[in-house]
Amino acid sequence: SRGLGDVYKRQLENKVVLCVPEGSDKGIDSFDSLAEHLKAEDILFCMGNSDVPVGQYTQKILAYYDLDEAALAAAGVITYGSNVKEVTTQISEGSVDAGVVYCTDAYSAGLTPVDEATAEMCGQVIYPAAVLKTAPNAEAAREFLAYLQTDRAATVFEGVGFTAM
């Protein structure tokens, strides 16, 4: 916490979610069912590249289910996006049967998540907030941080897909 003052909060969580195209008939309604379809190699799945944070979370989910990403990619079951927008676009357009994105990106793209990854699957995506020790106006920063903790602010954040903590 070097550089942080006495006020540090775990502010928001962005869930890692599974989405499918609208009207999908593949029966993918959970990460468990996704894993079964990937094992059967009967779907096309989109995830972020390994240098994209959501791709790294997806790799952890694949490992959680003992799925071999390289083998699935070689079998033509996985397609990649160089950023999360590419993943949401492939899902929205129905180019793939399922994909993993952040809840906020699903919201922005008009996608409805069918499942949320648990912390055991891939950890948590946490956004902290803090008042810096070197803040030129620490009192105003503390007041703003206090505002961020209100129900009003939580409603705004939750309205775009975040989970207030």
Where are the regions that the model predicts?
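A ligand-binding cleft/hinge motif common to bilobed small-molecule-binding domains
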Residues: S1-R2, I91-D115, A119-G123
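Hydrophobic/proline-rich hinge and linker segments of small-molecule sensing/allosteric domains
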Residues: Q11-S30
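Periplasmic-binding protein-like
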Residues: Y107-A146, L148-M165
